[in-house]
From Swiss-Prot:
Origin species: Candida glabrata (strain ATCC 2001 / BCRC 20586 / JCM 3761 / NBRC 0622 / NRRL Y-65 / CBS 138)
Spans annotated as Disordered: 1-47, 94-165, 287-321, 479-511
Coiled coil: 239-272
Basic and acidic residues: bias regions: 133-148
GO cellular component: cellular bud neck; cellular bud tip; exocyst; incipient cellular bud site; transport vesicle
Annotated InterPro entries: Cullin_repeat-like_dom_sf, Exo84, Exo84_C, Exo84_C_1, Exo84_C_2, PH-like_dom_sf
Polar residues bias (residue ranges): 289-318
Protein name per UniProt: Exocyst complex component EXO84
Gene: EXO84
Major location category of this protein: cytoplasm
Biological role: Involved in the secretory pathway as part of the exocyst complex which tethers secretory vesicles to the sites of exocytosis. Plays a role in both the assembly of the exocyst and the polarization of this complex to specific sites of the plasma membrane for exocytosis. Also involved in assembly of the spliceosome.
GO BP of this protein: exocyst assembly; exocyst localization; Golgi to plasma membrane transport; protein transport; spliceosomal complex assembly
The protein's assembly and partners: Component of the exocyst complex.
Length: 764
């Protein structure tokens, strides 16, 4: 390629010299026109074309740029052959061995790069290669005829890529660059922390040939690719490990949060246990002190027991009521309210302070709708408290997620439901504001309704009880005040005078004017409660205080439907009140009478609630407990009345379940079995429960049984009015059931005979 380029340049400058010669000849001709010439070619000299002209630096640059342009245009014709430098060049020894030449074994053929591409000292070589040089050239640089000749004939084609690769000789292990062509050794060299690129190139590659540099470059490129792939694999592996660690950390954080909340709850429970234990230890210590003081000085103990001890009653025998559970419950309520005030902006301002306020239910996922268009307005949460209803909507404030939308006392709130859409609730806050709320869960809607109704019922009961108690206390105080003014002369008062004093013949008293009511309430507060706050530690005042505390315990037990505990506390309060002597002071006498009226009222409350709870119950065990409670309360007549009313209701319920039948005989038989068997069972229960008052109450029982038998025959008579006949089988079964009552001491055969006598014409 280089020779061809030089030849072109030489021809170019040769033509340039001839043109300059022609120009000189033209000038000579023009000069010699004036002179006659006989032979114009006589003095012609032939230029020496073998010698190239001398060029200055400018002309050389111009020629080089021209040659570069020509080579760039005709690249396809003058490009160098493609050589694969990634594999070692073939040697003449390997080719000769493939041709059949014998080579000495045990030696590795070496590649003489200097002989193939010229020595590196810059000396020029002959344009015509020798046979030895031609035999040592690579296949790609040899003429095709020589390759075919050395491979076994002129007619054979060139070998394929696979055969050429098998003919490539391995690298010489004795070469100074052998360790640079192996990835492992090159990686080891480059990974040295003290590696210097300039020093490495200066020491190791300063004497390398172009082929060695190309091989080193290819090896370095492959090593770089391997390193990049390895880096990618490591990055991907690290990414997966980071994702795994992140997931594990997320799970661990969730578990830690749950553990933190559990530990917080456990801490609260342990604190509550510690509080309960301390109060219990304190009460036990005080009880021991009272027991140790009793035998030493009985009179002193009796006088000291009149003081308000912390853990004993009047006699110092029973421990004080433990209110730790109430305290724990109040703490829970306070925590719930604090959370509500923190999450809802303006909740504390709208609700205000109140005692015993607590949260009943918190319901989310509610939507406020426009009443007219039914379009959603905002997402809200409902809070039902024991005395108020609060509705909170979403807010954009970062400190509070919710803001108060509606807040109203529960006594002024009404809720109405939609029959078609059971997930919608209409809230009427007072008399003017009405809102419509909807949820997606019908169970949540029913839960809110139940909580609201429960709060409404509890508030109504509390209000009614307070009004009733206040009314009774006022009436009793007015009555006591009037009787104390004129003792022993109540019977001599005329009806007109009684009416003028606020008393009617049918009732004990009536409330006076508003000023009088206020005076009575002040006297009650001063008499019962103020002395405990002062330093007046008289025995009678503290007895009054302890009895009043027992009455409060009765109210608590009644609210929890613990009738046995309520009866025990009531009997204890009555016994303590009975030990008190008649007070000398008029104010103490009024308080004593007020406490007596309170105890009578609690007795009536127990009677009413026990009767209401057991009047329609079908379980005999609960009925027995209710009757026993009334007997312990000293009301055996009321207990018997409860038992008989319950059995009458049971008979009526079972008879309604029997219903009418197409067979009158079967129907009358079932009626007889139901009624007479229940009568028999009632007599048995009466003997078990009222064995002490059997003689006094047996007449009431017999009267009830007789009345039930009469009701039976009256029912049969109504059945016969329809034209049915009384079969002998029905009479036989009725007689059998009546005879069965003789086992419990009742004989009503005469009533059956009387019935048959009156209906003899209807016998079938």
């Amino acid at each position: 390629m280089v020779d061809f380029s030089l030849r072109k340049t030489r021809n170019y400058w040769k033509g340039s010299n001839s043109s300059s010669k022609q120009n000189s000849e033209v000038s000579l001709k023009n000069a010699e026109k004036k002179k006659p010439v006989t032979n114009p070619y006589a003095n012609l000299t032939v230029p020496n074309a073998a010698n190239l002209p001398t060029l200055d630096a400018k002309e050389r640059n111009k020629a080089a740029s021209s040659m570069q342009r020509r080579l760039s245009i005709h690249t396809a014709n003058y490009t160098a052959p493609n050589l694969d430098y990634s594999m070692p060049l073939p040697s003449s020894n390997l080719i000769d061995q493939a041709m059949g030449d014998e080579q000495p074994t045990g030696k590795v053929p070496a590649i003489n790069v200097d002989d193939e591409y010229g020595q590196r000292n810059g000396h020029s070589r002959s344009a015509t290669p020798t046979d030895n040089e031609t035999s040592r050239r690579p296949e790609t640089l040899r003429p095709p005829e020589l390759n075919r000749k050395r491979l076994g004939g002129s007619g054979s084609s060139a070998p394929s890529g696979s055969s050429r690769m098998t003919m490539v000789a391995p690298l010489n292990p004795l070469s100074p660059y052998a360790n640079l062509f192996h990835p492992a050794s090159l990686r080891k060299i480059l990974s040295d922390p003290q590696f210097s690129a300039k020093k490495f190139i200066h020491e190791r590659l300063s004497e390398a040939s172009a082929v060695d540099i190309d091989l080193f470059t290819s090896n370095l490129t492959e090593l770089s690719t391997d390193v990049q792939e390895e880096v990618k694999r490591n990055i991907y592996k690290s990414y997966n490990e980071i994702i795994t660690v992140n997931n594990d950390l997320h799970e661990a954080s969730a578990e830690l949060k749950q553990l933190r909340s559990s530990i917080s709850e456990l801490t609260k429970v342990t604190d509550q246990f510690v509080t309960v234990a301390k109060s219990r230890i304190q009460m036990d210590e005080q009880q021991k002190m009272l027991h140790t003081q009793r035998p030493s000085s009985p009179q002193k103990t009796q006088s000291s027991s009149l003081l308000p001890p912390v853990s004993s009653d009047i006699n110092g025998t029973n421990p004080k009521r433990d209110r730790t559970s109430v305290m724990i419950l109040e703490k829970m309520w306070d925590t719930q309210l604090a959370t509500l005030y923190k999450n809802v902006e303006g909740a504390q301002k709208h609700l205000g302070p109140a005692s015993n306020r607590h949260l009943l239910i918190e319901s989310s996922d509610w939507t406020e709708l426009n009443i007219s268009t039914q379009k959603p307005l905002q997402t809200v949460q409902l809070y039902i408290l024991n005395d108020a209803v609060l509705v909170a909507g979403k807010t954009k404030n970062k400190q509070h997620e919710l803001i108060v939308s509606q807040c109203c006392p529960i006594r002024d709130v009404t809720i109405s439901t939609d029959r078609e859409y059971r997930t919608k609730l209409m809230f009427n806050f007072g008399n003017s504001n009405t809102c419509l709320y909807e949820t997606r869960d019908i169970n949540e809607c029913m839960r809110v309704l139940d909580a609201f109704r429960k709060a409404k019922d509890d508030l109504r009961d509390i209000t009614e009880n307070e009004k009733e108690n206040s009314k009774r206390i006022k009436e009793s105080l007015v009555y006591l005040q009037n009787t104390q003014q004129t003792p022993g002369r109540e019977g001599s008062k005329s009806p007109a005078k009684r009416r003028s004093m606020g008393l009617s013949p049918s009732s004990a008293s009536r409330p006076l004017s508003a000023s009088m009511d206020q005076f009575i309430l002040q006297n009650l507060s001063i008499s019962v409660h103020s002395r405990s706050k002062s330093h007046d530690w008289s025995s009678l005042s503290h007895k009054f205080k302890l009895v009043d505390n027992l009455i409060e315990e009765v109210d608590i037990d009644l609210a929890r439907l613990k009738f046995d505990s309520a009866v025990n506390t009531l009997l204890e309060a009555e016994s303590q009140l009975a030990t008190m002597k008649d007070p000398t002071k008029e104010e103490d006498a009024i308080i004593l009478n007020v406490l007596t009226l309170k105890l009578d009222q609690r007795r009536d409350d127990i009677l009413t609630k026990v009767t209401q709870r057991n009047l329609f119950i079908n379980e005999i065990a609960h009925l027995r407990e209710g009757v026993k409670t009334l007997i312990r309360l000293g009301l055996p007549e009321a207990g018997l009345d409860l038992l008989l009313q319950n059995k009458s209701n049971l008979i009526q319920e079972l008879l309604l379940q029997v219903g009418s039948s197409e067979h009158p005989s079967l129907y009358l038989t079932e009626l007889a079995i139901v009624r007479f068997q229940i009568i028999k069972r009632t007599v048995i229960v009466f003997r078990e429960l009222f064995h002490r008052d059997h003689d006094k109450l047996s007449s009431i029982l017999v009267s009830w049984c007789s009345h039930e038998v009469e009701k039976h025959f009256n029912l049969v008579s109504k059945q016969l009015l329809n034209g049915d006949k009384l079969s002998p089988d029905a009479i036989r079964y009725s007689r059998k059931q009546i005879d069965d009552l003789k086992t419990v001491g009742l004989d009503f055969v005469y009533k059956l005979d009387e019935f048959i006598k009156n209906n003899i014409n209807k016998l079938g």
